[in-house]
Amino acid sequence: LAGIAGAGAIAAAVVLLPVVLLCVQAFVPPFDALMISTGSEPLRLLPIPFSAEQWQMLFNQSTYWQAFWNSLIWTVGACVVQVMVAFLGGYVLAKYPARWCVAIAGLYTLMMLMPPQMTLLPIYRVAYANKLLNHPMLLYAPIAFAPFGTFFMRQWLLRWPDELTEYLRLEGGSSVKLLWYCLAPYSLPGMLALFALTFTEGWNQVEQPLMLVSDSLRQPLSALLKDLSAGNPQIVFAASVASILPIALVMLAVLVQQGSKRKAA
């Protein structure tokens, strides 16, 4: 076990090393960051001299805040819709004794095998025909109704005992009460995990914004990161860290919630 733990620690260090180095470069002076980004100077192992000027320059740009709020509002909205749709759809596919539920679950599985890039052209043609290009909804509606969430929640709810459902119904519990008071608390860890995964997918979109949204005022932060760095290459490291910080905070919040729940149990 000690050997496995040591190997896991080494693997984690290798994975986290690029992120740590990126964070270190985000706190060097802008001129030094420019030299590092062009390869004129090597990466710093420590932020010496320490400087927060990159962050000041980044936060003083209105373009950054516009893209940030575009990403945050639409991504959170898509995550909320995805969790609700996945929870209800997963309940139907997991607990309704009908053959068509099994067929639909199989169809969801097949749809999950399709890469997102395959749907870009159909979405573009539909949006162009209906004059919906440049609307952020094009980016986040496919995420809000993605088949993965329903499949994920179906697998989660399959573990709920059918006998317990029958007992609750015999006690006079309706489907609404069963969902709200029993299945929702039971599925909360799964819904939080799905929220975090959906947030990561929505926040990190690159191909979809470049193809479907040409208006820079409506593009998310992930698409404008290159333009921000090109106009001000001295803030490239701070902009990169700022783009991954919301994902890290969401993941950390989910882990803290799960840890506190285990301690309470």
Regions found by a protein language model. Name each.
Residues 4-265:
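A structural signal for multi-pass alpha-helical bundles of membrane permease subunits
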